[in-house]
């Protein structure tokens, strides 16, 4: 076998072996609950953004989420993130969201006040508390 073929074969093996390594990512999960009574937010999504990365995870019926770049739970690159949380009942046939379950301040990372840092020696679980929507004034 020529030197070039050996090099290419070794490179392929190295790439295949490293594909399973997750040195720069961490599995991250957590739960979203309401600040007033501790009950879980059971519908919605958690989205985290850094300058270059966006990860997300859907909430399950107990308010739990697993984060990932491509799929829920595939891991989060190390770094500092701003967090936003979406929570509404379901999308209406008109395409508009249904009833909002959380305060609108949580919809945008720059307004939510929620952040977290993912690092190799840091926590792997991040729990968030959200407020219910503020009451709307009724016009008479």
Question: Which residues fall in each region the model found?
Answer:
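Sec-dependent bacterial lipoprotein signal peptides
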Residues: 1-19
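Beta-strand-dominated extracellular/periplasmic modules and repeats
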Residues: 21-140
């Amino acid at each position: 076998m020529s030197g070039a073929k050996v090099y290419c074969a070794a490179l392929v093996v190295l790439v295949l072996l490293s594909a399973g390594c997750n040195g720069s990512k961490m599995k991250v999960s957590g739960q979203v609950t309401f600040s007033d009574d501790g009950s879980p937010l059971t519908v919605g999504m958690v989205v985290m953004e850094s300058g270059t990365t966006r990860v997300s995870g859907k909430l399950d019926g107990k308010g739990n989420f697993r984060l990932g770049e491509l799929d829920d739970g595939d891991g989060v690159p190390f770094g500092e993130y701003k967090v936003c949380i979406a929570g509404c009942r379901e999308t209406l046939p008109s395409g508009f969201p249904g009833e909002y379950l959380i305060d609108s301040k949580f919809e945008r990372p720059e307004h939510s006040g929620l952040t977290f840092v993912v690092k190799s020696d840091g926590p792997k679980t991040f729990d968030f508390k959200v407020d219910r929507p503020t009451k709307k004034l009724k016009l008479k």
